[in-house]
Amino acid sequence: MRWFWLGCFSYCAAVSGAEPPHRIASYSPGATQTLLDLGSSAQIVATTRWCPLPKTHPAVRTCDAFNPDLETLLQAKPDLVILPRLANPLWAERCTRAGLKIIILQTEGPDSVTRDLELLGEATHQQAAAKALRAQLDRPAASGPRTLLIVWDGMMAGPDAYTTPVLKQAGFKSPLQAGTWVKLDWELLVQAKPDAILWIDSKPENTPISPSQSRQKELSQIIVVKELKSVKTSQIYATTSGSHWLPGSGLILASEKLTELSKVLK
């Protein structure tokens, strides 16, 4: 396995000096959004079915990170394969043994998105575009912070999640003490005492952040939760994931939504 990881890192280090890829296969929806924002749409030939491509985009949607198939991947003839940070090492090794160049995205952390952006910018020779996007993700933090708990697919975003920088830009922080994503637990939520709660529903559409009457009603019926100030004062909001909340450049628009939320928060 050591030779595989050394080969992977060597490629990532040298990729900026190589010819840019002409056929990219992406197993990461967040990376796909970043490629689009970098201006590399025409180079994308294969993605997952969850990737935020326009309906008319010619790329095949055959990349499946949960059940990958090498023969199907090779049919797309990629010269670069982008794998998510949670990719099975054995799958990455199979790709390398088949002669495919790969990039493995960063392990999740507060700076993982900007590091991925820099890496993908170098790989596609779109360094200037990557620098411009990073400048938007690196905007100074707003005054605050107030605490906002993000709940998504039964998990709560902690201070080590990739969402932390965009929360800071809007003057928020996670009320949790540690972790990337923590399983939703009502007692832990009560202990965290968030100033507001944002529920993200996994849907392909991008929607604004708005007050959620259904989530408000749900939380008001839970004995250990209904006494929270954020519940009593109706500071319960919801949005859809779309492409804006994925770990990629789409977070620039998520940051704008959070900034608007901070203006109306009671």
Task: Annotate each PLM feature.
Residues 22-38, 126-172, 239, 244:
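Basic- and aromatic-lined ligand-binding clefts that recognize polyanionic substrates
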Residues 7-17:
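Hydrophobic h-region of N-terminal signal peptides that target proteins for export
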Residues 22-86:
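A short, structured surface patch at a secondary-structure boundary
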Residues 70-78, 98, 185-193:
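Short helices/loops that flank or line small-molecule/ion binding pockets
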Residues 49-53, 59, 159-182:
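Alpha-helical, coiled-coil/dimerization segments enriched in small aliphatic residues
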